[in-house]
């Protein structure tokens, strides 16, 4: 059997971080088992499902690197209405579905009664049964189509995350599978799609647990082999509450990209939200695929920890090739009005500073002083700069100007003799030198920094 999983987002304007975690686990499960990962766009909400909102999903999937095996044949529900109507007609013909003519007022009365009695909402008055007389069909009423849910027994499955789950069928309504205007409903469309796509494992959020028994009964009615189900726990914000855009939480996956998070780090972090491989916190996507097993997913909710996300991101920045980092940082430098990054070569700069930042924006900031002296912080000036330091910098500039070879070793070899002559420790030279050349007291080894900045530029900055 070829394992087939799917990710089925609805285009709502952004790709939710929780959806990406679901997609990641589905993708990793398929890749681990050498199977297929499929994408389906559940776009039946025509008011919200614009081309732009669909592209946001596709772009988000591309950014995080979750490739899908039906890229040339993505399933769109709006293109499958004829298929849904065909299956509904089959269910009606077999007696597994029926027309219901209840008015809104009748349904509301049933709902109130059910809440009081703790029973299923719909009283099944239009459900055909042997020996039962149905009400007279009202004039001018367009019926909905309901699925004929079994009245006895239980619907159960062994959830790949939550374990054994059992729901009494008497607790289930006769689900509406087609509205009065003929459009099919979510649960029905999802069942038909999963059946036609050959999905073997449905991995999704645990907010779908209550949908599962309804979908299982429909699958049985159409004669399908049942897939296995795994329901993932919710992701909570740092306060332990449901992630919400209204609460100021970052929820769109593209927003994390704007924050300077690498896609590989995002996947690494999301993988650790609910799944564990021993004490491993930092790993590559390839390692995650190799290690991933749903039995290692906790059924308990996971809590966001942005501090840990940034730490993981910093670790991924360290192992990212300098050439790749260059392409990621260059546009961020352009936003900071640094457009010429050939002298010094940005790739060389990044090789020196990439272990000093935990996101790409901070990394771009770390590169600025190589191209333009920054305005020093008042606290640094007060601590490391005075008239004596200024005079000392001019004297050291003369030593630098005398160098024939401009490299880190040659610059470093000037430090000790100069400090001995001045009767000072290295800090009295290094910190003012950083301020004079870079505009900050926090840099990598100052000889390496000066070596990357040209001799002419270093002397110009010191003597400015």
UniProtKB/Swiss-Prot annotation:
The protein's Enzyme Commission number: 6.1.1.17
Gene3D superfamilies: 1.10.10.350, HUPs (3.40.50.620)
Molecular function (Gene Ontology), one example: zinc ion binding
PROSITE patterns: AA_TRNA_LIGASE_I
CDD domains from the UniProt entry: GluRS_core (cd00808)
Keywords: Aminoacyl-tRNA synthetase, ATP-binding, Cytoplasm, Ligase, Nucleotide-binding, Protein biosynthesis
PANTHER family to which the protein is assigned, alphabetical: GLUTAMATE--TRNA LIGASE, GLUTAMATE--TRNA LIGASE, MITOCHONDRIAL-RELATED
Family indicated by similarity: Belongs to the class-I aminoacyl-tRNA synthetase family. Glutamate--tRNA ligase type 1 subfamily.
Function as written in the Swiss-Prot or TrEMBL entry: Catalyzes the attachment of glutamate to tRNA(Glu) in a two-step reaction: glutamate is first activated by ATP to form Glu-AMP and then transferred to the acceptor end of tRNA(Glu).
Official protein name in the record: Glutamate--tRNA ligase
The gene coding this protein: gltX
């Amino acid at each position: 059997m070829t394992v087939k999983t799917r990710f089925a987002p609805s285009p709502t304007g952004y790709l939710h971080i929780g959806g990406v975690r679901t997609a990641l686990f589905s993708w990793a499960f398929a890749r681990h088992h050498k199977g297929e990962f499929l994408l389906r766009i559940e776009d039946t909400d025509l008011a919200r499902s614009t081309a732009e909102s669909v592209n946001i999903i596709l772009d988000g999937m591309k950014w995080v690197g979750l490739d899908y095996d039906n890229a040339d044949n993505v399933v769109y529900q709006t293109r499958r209405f004829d298929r849904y109507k065909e299956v509904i007609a089959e269910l009606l013909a077999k007696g597994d579905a029926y027309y219901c003519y209840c008015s809104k007022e009748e349904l509301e009365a049933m709902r109130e009664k059910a809440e009081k009695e703790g029973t299923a909402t719909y009283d099944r008055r239009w459900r055909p049964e042997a020996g039962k007389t149905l009400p007279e069909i009202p004039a001018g009423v367009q019926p909905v189509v309901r699925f004929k849910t079994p009245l006895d027994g239980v619907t159960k499955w062994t959830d790949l995350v939550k374990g054994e789950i059992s729901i009494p069928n008497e607790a289930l309504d006769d689900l509406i599978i087609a509205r009065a205007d003929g459009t099919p409903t979510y649960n029905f469309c999802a069942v038909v799609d999963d059946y036609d796509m050959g999905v073997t494992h449905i991995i999704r959020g645990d907010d779908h647990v209550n949908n599962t028994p309804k979908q299982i009964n429909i699958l049985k009615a159409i004669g399908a082999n049942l897939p296995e189900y795994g329901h993932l726990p919710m992701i909570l914000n740092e306060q332990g509450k449901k992630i919400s855009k209204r609460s100021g939480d970052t929820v769109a996956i593209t927003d994390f990209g704007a924050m300077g998070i690498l896609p590989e780090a995002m996947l690494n972090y999301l993988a650790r939200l609910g799944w564990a491989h021993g004490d491993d916190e930092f790993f590559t996507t390839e390692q995650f695929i190799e290690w991933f097993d749903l039995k290692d997913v906790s059924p308990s909710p996971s809590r966001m920890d942005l501090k840990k996300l940034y730490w993981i991101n910093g670790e991924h920045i360290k192992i990212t090739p300098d050439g790749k980092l260059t392409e990621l940082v260059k546009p961020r430098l352009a936003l900071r009005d640094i457009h010429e990054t050939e002298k010094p070569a940005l790739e060389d700069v990044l090789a020196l500073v990439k272990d000093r930042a935990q996101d790409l924006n901070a990394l771009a900031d770390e590169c600025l002083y190589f191209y333009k002296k920054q305005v020093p912080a008042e606290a640094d000036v007060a601590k490391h700069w005075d008239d004596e330091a200024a005079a000392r910098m001019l004297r050291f500039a003369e030593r630098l100007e005398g160098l024939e070879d401009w490299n880190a070793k040659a610059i470093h070899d000037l430090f000790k003799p100069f400090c001995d002559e001045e009767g000072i420790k290295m800090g009295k030279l290094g910190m003012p030198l950083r301020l004079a050349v870079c505009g900050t007291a926090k840099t990598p080894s100052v000889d390496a920094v000066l070596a990357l900045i040209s001799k002419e530029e270093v002397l110009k900055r010191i003597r400015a």
